[in-house]
């Protein structure tokens, strides 16, 4: 029996349109998986929408002199336009600022309270005497206590640290610039700590990827109750308290349920537990697609809410997309170093973007968008390999037969080489299916490319243009037709528009069967991206940041992520660093440390003890045998009383990944 799948995408925040990073991490992957699951005959719905509440909306509205609703409606429409242009399809798409959602969120809150998970607590919060109101974190700005840069009450853009408003130096109210005062007030809290054992069991039995499980475990070990109310007017009102609204991270995920309810009673089949024994519905799979910056919210807080409510199915898996940089630099909307979806699709087919963003790197890893790399990958992979084969096969079949030839009994009529290639098609389907179910989208595309390469090699070897035997020619082009049909079928979830054009030329349906229908005259479906186009688009879309870079070209200093000036070094200084491939032999936790693991590593000629701040991202057990990159000539240092004889290289902020050699190099290999 086929499963029911409910796919959700993180609710886009209505303070701006979509950029390429949003498309890559969340929306395109979800649409690809939805199309794939439907191809396999599953019952699938895709639910999404926009997140409309919170302080950033009110701040923007106040600055522009409009109502919050005006900001919400403007960007809700722009975001939906962008998603439509990316061919991202939804079965239900809503807004959190709607009667349906507000009512549903309040009912959810009441159920949590009824079950004993909501309580009141007195806290201290900044209060502006001039504005006569308590200030939510975004209404307070000041200097960062760590880097002295300008910072908001929740975050420093300069050094990237998470902040509490009370940590700011010289804080001020962003509305009137007055100095706020700390004043006692009452907030509502969700008793998340009471659910730690339930959450631990949930994560253990879920199908989440290991890196997400590890992150969830690190939070569950030290769970605190959660402040879920804010003293502002814009949001979902707390029932029976007109002075406070729900914190957006309490009410926004409930939108997944609200927007499914918009489809009618069918929502119950996806969300509600079995009526007879109140157990999870095993035939329903809920998969969340999100950006990695909100992984903890979906892996810990949201399941905690569902557990506290008690009547809903829990998510089966979470797929978190990594960050996307632009031309090697972090995207920044404030610095205008960003490419908006709406601008991009004015110049390039959205299917090309879908292909590139998924082919560029595994979904959970950070990657870079470079216009030159975009052009190169499209031209050398999609055009030179995939399109080259399919176009040649269709042109030749059209000229010789007017259709894709059909052979009724391939196992009797084809030779061993032909049959081996048909077996290759079956093997490709098998590998592709596994990669798609695991959301390994890059690997799934590699499967397609390998099949197209096999087709090109076969076509060249058979040289059908030299074959006089019509029966043999029919056999050759039948094999080419089977491969072409497989490529179109497998590529469809990634490039729905282009593959539909291809199938239209073939006069075929979206499956793996060849019917021998009359071919339309082949035309070029996949067009090469020219150098002049890339040059023109880069000048238009990267202009503001390039101008800024030109002004700063002569500077020989940069800033690190803490905002501190960083002197550039020469190659001689860099050459002093000794980097080697090491292998982890033993790993254990450092007592009384929240972040440190003690490792024993082999660097070829000796074993070293190293301390690394990767606890919570890796368990000791999964590190054994892993090859890493080690700085070997660093002076020994003590961390939490444990000596470290080197430094393990890793990357990432919220989600940390160890650096390892791309190929399986021998232990002790020098990295240069």
UniProtKB/Swiss-Prot annotation:
Pfam families per the UniProt record, alphabetical: Anticodon_3 (PF19303), tRNA-synt_1g (PF09334), tRNA_bind (PF01588)
UniProt short sequence motif 'KMSKS' region, positions renumbered to this chain: 330-334
The protein's assembly and partners: Homodimer.
Keyword Transcription carried by entry: no
Molecular function in Gene Ontology: ATP binding; metal ion binding; methionine-tRNA ligase activity; tRNA binding
Residues noted as binding ATP in the record, renumbered to the chain: 333
EC number: 6.1.1.10
Residues where Zn(2+) binds: 144, 147, 156, 159
GO cellular component: aminoacyl-tRNA synthetase multienzyme complex; cytosol
Organism: Methanococcus aeolicus (strain ATCC BAA-1280 / DSM 17508 / OCM 812 / Nankai-3)
Name used for this protein in its record: Methionine--tRNA ligase
């Amino acid at each position: 029996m086929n499963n029911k799948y409910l796919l959700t995408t993180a609710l886009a925040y209505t303070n701006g349109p979509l950029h390429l990073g949003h498309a890559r991490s969340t929306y395109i992957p979800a649409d690809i998986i939805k199309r794939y699951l439907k191809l396999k005959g599953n019952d699938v719905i895709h639910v999404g929408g926009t997140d409309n509440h919170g302080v950033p909306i009110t701040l923007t509205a106040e600055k522009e002199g409009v109502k919050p609703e005006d900001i919400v409606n403007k960007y809700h429409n722009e975001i939906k336009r962008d998603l439509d242009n990316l061919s991202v399809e939804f079965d239900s798409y809503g807004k959190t600022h709607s009667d349906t959602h507000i009512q549903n969120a309040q009912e959810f809150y009441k159920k949590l309270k009824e079950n004993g998970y909501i309580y009141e607590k007195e806290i201290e919060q900044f209060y502006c005497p001039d504005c006569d109101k308590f200030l939510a974190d975004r209404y307070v700005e000041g200097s960062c206590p760590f880097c002295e840069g300008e910072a908001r009450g929740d975050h420093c853009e300069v050094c990237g640290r998470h902040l509490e408003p009370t940590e700011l130096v010289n804080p001020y109210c962003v509305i009137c610039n007055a100095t706020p005062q700390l004043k006692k007030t009452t907030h509502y809290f969700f008793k998340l700590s009471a659910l730690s054992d339930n959450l631990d069991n949930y994560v253990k039995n879920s199908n989440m990827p290991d890196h997400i499980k590890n992150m969830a475990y690190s939070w569950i070990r030290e769970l605190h109750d959660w402040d879920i109310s804010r003293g502002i007017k814009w949001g979902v009102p707390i029932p029976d308290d007109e002075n406070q609204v729900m914190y957006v991270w309490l009410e926004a995920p409930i939108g997944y349920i609200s927007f499914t309810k918009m489809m009618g009673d069918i929502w119950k089949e996806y969300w509600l537990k079995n009526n007879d024994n109140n157990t999870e519905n095993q035939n329903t799979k809920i998969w969340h697609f999100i950006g990695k910056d909100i992984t903890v919210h979906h892996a810990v807080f949201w399941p905690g809410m569902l557990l506290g409510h008690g009547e809903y199915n829990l998510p089966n898996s979470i797929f978190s997309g990594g960050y996307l940089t632009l031309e090697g630099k972090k995207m920044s909307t404030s610095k205008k170093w960003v490419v908006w979806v709406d601008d991009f699709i004015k110049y390039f087919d959205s299917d090309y973007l879908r292909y590139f963003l998924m082919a560029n790197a595994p979904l959970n890893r950070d990657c870079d968008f470079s216009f030159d790399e975009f052009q190169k990958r499209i031209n050398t992979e999609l055009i030179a390999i995939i399109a080259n084969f399919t176009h040649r096969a269709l042109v030749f079949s059209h000229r010789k037969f007017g259709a894709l030839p059909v052979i009724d009994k391939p196992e009797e009529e084809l030779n061993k080489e032909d049959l081996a290639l048909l077996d290759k098609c079956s093997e490709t389907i098998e590998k592709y299916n596994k990669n798609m179910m695991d959301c390994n989208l890059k690997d799934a595309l590699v499967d397609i490319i390998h099949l197209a390469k096999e087709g090109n090699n076969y076509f060249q070897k058979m040289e059908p243009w030299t074959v006089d035997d019509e029966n043999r020619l029919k056999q050759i082009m039948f094999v080419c037709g089977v491969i072409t049909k497989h490529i179109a079928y497998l590529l469809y979830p990634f490039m729905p528009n282009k593959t539909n054009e291809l199938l239209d030329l073939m006069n075929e349906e979206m499956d793996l069967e060849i019917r021998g229908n009359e071919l339309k005259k082949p035309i070029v479906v996949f067009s090469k991206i020219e150098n002049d186009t890339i040059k023109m688009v880069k000048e238009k879309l990267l202009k503001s940041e390039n101008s800024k870079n030109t002004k700063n070209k002569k500077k020989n200093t940069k800033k690190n992520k803490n905002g501190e000036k960083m002197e550039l070094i020469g190659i001689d200084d860099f050459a002093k660093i000794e980097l080697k491939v090491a292998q982890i032999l033993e790993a254990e936790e450092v007592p009384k440390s929240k972040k440190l693991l003690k490792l024993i590593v082999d660097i070829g000629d000796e074993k070293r003890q190293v301390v690394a701040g990767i606890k919570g991202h890796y368990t000791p057990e999964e590190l054994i045998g892993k090859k890493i990159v080690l700085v070997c000539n660093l002076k020994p240092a003590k961390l939490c009383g444990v000596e470290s004889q080197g430094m393990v290289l890793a990357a990432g902020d919220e989600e940390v990944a160890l650096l390892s050699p791309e190929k399986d190099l021998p232990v002790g290999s020098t990295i240069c």
